Amino acid sequence: QDRWVYIWADGVYSGLRAEQTKLCALVVMGVNERGEKRFLAIEDGVRESTQSWREVLLKLKSRGMNVPELAIGDGAMGFWAALEEVYGETRQQRCWMHKTMNVLNCLPKSVQAKAKQALHAIWQAETKVDAEKAFDLFLETYEPKYPKATLCLHKDREELLAFYDFPAQHWQSIRTSNPIESTFATIRHRTKRSKGCLSRDGMLHMMFKLGQCAQKNWRRLRGFYYLAKVITGVEFKDGIEVTTIDQVAA
């Protein structure tokens, strides 16, 4: 039985010509203690529905999936409420890619380029303290004129900065739900020609099969050897093992 350390979740849409509603595949991907990434679930459902995600997570739990250390995904999903019910001990990391787009959508185009740089300054900071300072600076700069943008950012503050408590070698992978996004960009391209002749079940089955093929070519997670330490509860601060910091200080 594999031990799943990190999981990524997303709702992936693929339009079907025969139906008005778009198929949403609720996707969960995980990385095990050996650094191998796998699809854990590709299920039909409603992205914003807690019930849909609850069913997905309960199915995974019934199959014996352990409590993951960290879950990564977009904030605008029913996934998070379901996760708190089914795997309440799992830490949460909001996807910086989705959050950046959502914040910028609350701003006029004239300030978006500068605001994007300010957002990047947060997650690119080497320490959580520096990230907090950049976070505060963004809020102070844009709150007076654009309160919707700053509220969008501020409401997920803790969950946006969770990655600092995990190995720095993993940051690139755990800051966003890009592992799912990039894979499904390819799958979406492959299923495009078949949309007119597939049912919802047929499309879902095809996505699942293409997903299985895709994962055969995935590389192991960068810095996978740190996963064992994450599992055993080794503490990390600003991406560095706490004992290492203490030894250097001594």
Question: Model features per residue range: what roles?
Answer:
Residues 2-5, 24-26, 38-41, 51-58, ...:
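Conserved phosphate-chemistry cores used by DNA topoisomerases
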